[in-house]
Amino acid sequence: MVAPRPMTRDALMSAFGGESMAHMRYSIFADIAEKEGFPNVARLFRAIAFAEKVHARNHYQRLGELDTDAKVVAGAPFGPGNTSKNLSLAIRGEEFEINEMYPTYIKIAESQGETQAVISFKWALEAEKIHAELYKKAKEYVDKGEDMPIDGYIWICPVCGFTYVGKEPPPKCPICGALGEKFVKF
């Protein structure tokens, strides 16, 4: 795969950096939630951390035959706290990706005819919408001192990061079309 044009390349590198940091942040937040007695919220953080890793991998793979050292600029909320604060940080990060980052990156990649980057950005955008809603629901419970109830499991599509809660995965991913039997269970 040939390296993308410079503006798309920069967007992919920035998105890779942001998703990589989200993966680590959510992994740390999971440990905190576990210690505070919110095992389902911890499971949610771990599942979405995996989804963010999927997004980072997809962006990285679309960089093609790039051979460069680069400084990656990626904004991220910092300052871990208790689980309620961490959920607020997670919601803020997801909403930034939904409302600003991915719509802008999609426009850049579309304007440059970078189809694979557009796909990667769109897949991540759709998954982030679900992540934000799940984090909002979790925060409502945590703010009442309760763990978020999860009926079944949290399922993550290993291709695009789509996130689903239920006893079984969907038969097919509604974002990328991957078979549900390939989903990772949390």
Predicted regions and their residues:
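Non-heme di-metal
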Residues: 1-186
